[in-house]
Amino acid sequence: MTILFLFLIYLLSRQAAALVLASSASAQTAPPTVVIDSGHGGNDPGKIGVDGSLEKDLNLTIARKLKYYLEASGVQVIMTRDSDTGLYKETDSHKKTADLKARCQLINDTAPALTIRIHQNSYHEEAINGGQVFYYKTSEKGKRLADILQKRFDFVLGENNRRQAKPNDTYYLLLHVKSPIVIVECGFLSNWDEAARLNSTDYQDRLAWTLHMGILRYLNTQ
């Protein structure tokens, strides 16, 4: 099963890469740039799962896999972090604020075609589960990207995922990043079954793959 999945990934990656590169060539422009923002890091673990797993670690693992698939498809990728670090200085008195501002500055300086923030969710009721995508409420491009990615969750979660892309006007990066940006909450670490899936290499691969396919669809319809 794993070999078949990897073979299908190889074939589809070649087709997807051809679409992206053909689009860039016809427009005589450089390949599109995507920023992948892996949430938390350093002294900020993010959510802590019922199994003890740390959100910051899962975010980075999924982000790295997503980067691999996107680059294989001809997309230029910038990571806000590629190690267990935050974007703050040890001398910063408010590290969380400094971290968010630094991420925002990096993204705006890059001016990418889009930014995808990788996060994990948590809730006080263990039964709550599912993946959800957030976008800035007045961003038409953000909404379109969020809708595409939200539908991609059906490929990894099936019909059990009844969530819809959700507008937001309070999250710092959604407010201050100038290019299209979405936040992908991959699942709930407070749910035992979902935490186990999110820690599974196979599930991480499938999730990163399907997010990458959603991003390519968005880029190819620009």
Language-model features, listed with the residues they occupy:
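Active-site-adjacent mobile loop/cap segments within catalytic or ligand-binding domains
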Residues: 110, 124, 162-222
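Short gly/ser/thr-rich secondary-structure transition/capping motifs
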Residues: 17-18, 96-98, 163-168
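Active-site-adjacent substrate-binding region
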Residues: 142-167
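Short, charged, low-complexity patches
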Residues: 59, 142, 146, 200, ...
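Hydrophobic/aromatic residues positioned on beta-strands within the core alpha/beta folds
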Residues: 37-38, 186
